Amino acid sequence: GRIADIAIDPKNENVWYVAVGSGGVWKTENSGTTWTPLADKMPFYSTGCITIDPHNNASIWLGTGENVGGRHVGIGHGVYHSKDGGKSWKDMGLKKSEHISKIIVHPEDPNTVWVASQGPLWSPGGERGLFKTTDGGKTWKNKLDINEWTGVTDLVIDPTNPNVLYAASWQKHRNVAALIGGGPGTSLYKSVDGGDNWSKIDKGLPRSNKGKIGLAISPMQPNVLYAAVELDKRAGAVYRSNNSGGSWKKMSDTVSGGTGPHYYQELVASPHVFDKIYLMNVRVLVSDDGGKNFYTMSERQKHSDNHSLTFKANDPNYMLIGTDGGIYESFDDSASWKFVGNLPLTQFYKLAVDDAEPFYNIYGGTQDNNTQGGPSRTFEYSGISNSHWFVVLGGDGHQPATEPGNPDIIYAQSQQGYINRIDMTNGEAVSVRPQEGIDEPYERFNWDSPILVSYHDPKRLYFGTQRVWRSENRGDSWTAVSGDLTKDEERLSLPIMGRVQSFDNAWDVYAMSTYNTVTSLSESRIDENILYAGTDDGIIQYTRDGGENWTKMTVDNLPGTPSSAFVNDIKADLHDTETAYVLLDNHKFGDYKPYMFKTTNGGKKWVSITKGIPDGTLLWRIVQDHVNPNLLFLGTEYGVYISLDQGDNWHKFSNGLPTIPVRDLAIQKRENDLVLATFGRSFYVLDDYSPLRDMTQENLTNDGVIFEPRKALQFNQIYGGTSSDGGQTYYADNPRYG
């Protein structure tokens, strides 16, 4: 999972605090041998920065909301403070900040704290800028309020004079279709009075639209500053100042790349070697001469996509780095790396389960960590360990699928619809991505393209682009069963930052997901001719004749729904051909309301079914029990909900779950297990939920109820695996034996 920040306790370097982009806050007291989650029951899951008070190492300040500008960024709930080393937290406000990138505690006054807030990514306004408190967080004042699209992305303090601070502002806006990652609001600022007043320090910087800036100050010579500046469309440069920001000199044209500077660009100055700086990037870039020349840091056997770098005070060879694949340690200045493999932080987008015997397998597509598979349980007393899991396909993983009755065939895909059929007996992967024909428009694939295997024929597949495709032979050939089901717009002509922008502005087209695509597909279990499709641009389409004719409905025809809402999920009812469910999502336009509707007359009329779901809760996926039509499960931004009356009422159903997005759910029908794909805390399984089918009002008022026992499999547990590997091997518990 993605690591946002790491803080090492200066008084006890065995103690680390880890802020996870989507996965909460964690603490180790033994250098990563064991871990304790610190915020599982808090109202947030996404964090951007963590700071240890220099006066009191039990005083921890936490900024929530990721500090990157990616399409899958987690949203925060302000600033939190702990006085007991993370055992408990107090809400300190700034709830509308959404993304906090840096917190600094005054080195002489613990009641004075500065907070760099990027502000909302998806909308204007909010609490963005440079906030200061002088009363320990009781009140805050925005000392650098630039405009409704510009926040502060980086902040450093002069180690010899706490009245001198430097800040980097960042103007940006993202929506479902596009990203502008820069603008005239982006600049560098300096304060000489403890952050009360700020002045621009941009002499020597270019006048073009600047994007994300990483800022660093030399610990040895604090008059020396470094700035990694994104310029226009993904270009950039590193600048150096020898006079405390009075002027800047361009050192090189270096900029972070990959998915774009908006995702990296943190700049770190070595505390041990003057003029040695590190630029976070897909691969870390290192300069030994103040930014003139950069080389790629050795990252052999280490995950890419770096975000955080931390040092120990008295060991120049030690490095602790946070990546999209977790935490790594080096004891020899990056010559080799040790993986901290016992943090369950994988970000799963989607999942699928097979029907392998004796234990079924779970497959999931992840952010930055491939498509992975593993067993639902093992024969070993020790449980399910890292070694039981395997990589099915590389890249960012997305929606997988399995073939009923044949666990040897699965489908896995990487981003933008690169779908493969995998033969699990020999590992053979065959691309089965549908392609447009001669003289047809280019096929558009969503970042997370939908695939489903037919209920009616396990060799029949459906796949979504801007069209719906059908294959009768496991993807060897495809036939389009629809035309373009989307609005087919020119996305650069859509308003962003409040208006239509010139093409010459700071668009980051490489960081944009393909737009005007199908995002969700469903087939009726009862009638193979009934199909539903939903799009990312607010359209629901359905056919009752196998794709010969489609009926179109825009989502603004649903009660209280904006036309921009993204179709996260659409499901045909398993028991009734006239009933279906749709989940909509408008958070990429700054709207966090839950939108969910049901039709019981084949799509002619839809009614809202969100009773019991709090405002501000995004809805991701819905599944229906295959036996009891009234029993529904719902994956949301903050856990799982259950309905016992076909969606009329919803109840939180997250006992044992941390606060985390549940992006997908699946039911393993043989075992009656509910499997969850979380975006930051890996998989969770609810074993045999079948008693919930009998949660009737009558049974709830009875003194007792005897449930039918489940069919059991007899087997002997064994000792084995890696149970003697020590605390750094992660184990998940097997279901209870016996």
Indicate where each model-derived feature is located.
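Beta-propeller blade termini and top-face loops
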Residues: G1-Y731
